[in-house]
């Protein structure tokens, strides 16, 4: 797909683009929480491309400080490969350990709804060749809520000897303060937390 050619440096153009994007993402109840379903973007190629363009616009200023891009299972997979191909950066997955071979590092975390354990716990892993010591990483996902998944991703990357330059999301539920949790998890005080939309945009 070709870029939308919108001038996203123009605040009004960007504002209108984000408003249109929000209309494409339904909010539905799922496992006891309000779920922002970015799957709606898949049915609208124009808005999907717009999401790519908005991501590119947001990360371009610091991509020279990124060595690899990590994407969370599963919706992070929709966006990270596009960025990886465009900026020529390695892309790696953060998934449950039983979902892929050659797992090197694993961490347990807790999220908004129940995962592997009855207490709501889950596990996140990366593969042996995902990152190298000293790598600077951009993490990509669809949603930042309580920040449990993001925190786990940051700690996992750091456990492997790398650092997180930034995390980017389509939607952030600001009232849950996942941003604060993510920032606290990072050992790099300059780590950026970026979101295209918040719950106030819906």
PLM features per residue range, with description:
Residues 89-137:
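Short, glycine/charge-rich flexible loops or terminal/linker lids adjacent to PRPP-binding catalytic cores
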Residues 2-10, 14, 20-21, 151-202:
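PRPP-dependent phosphoribosyltransferase catalytic core
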Residues 67-68, 136-138, 166:
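Structural motif
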Residues 2-65:
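Active-site-facing substrate-recognition patch
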Residues 64-73:
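Short glycine-rich phosphate-binding loop at a beta-alpha junction
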Residues 85-91, 162:
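A short helix-loop-beta submotif of the ANL/AMP-binding
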Residues 142, 147:
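Conserved G/P- and acidic residue-centered "switch" motifs that form tight phosphate/ATP-binding loops
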Residues 78-87, 153-154:
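Short Gly/Thr/Asp-enriched flexible loops that form oxyanion-binding sites at enzyme active sites
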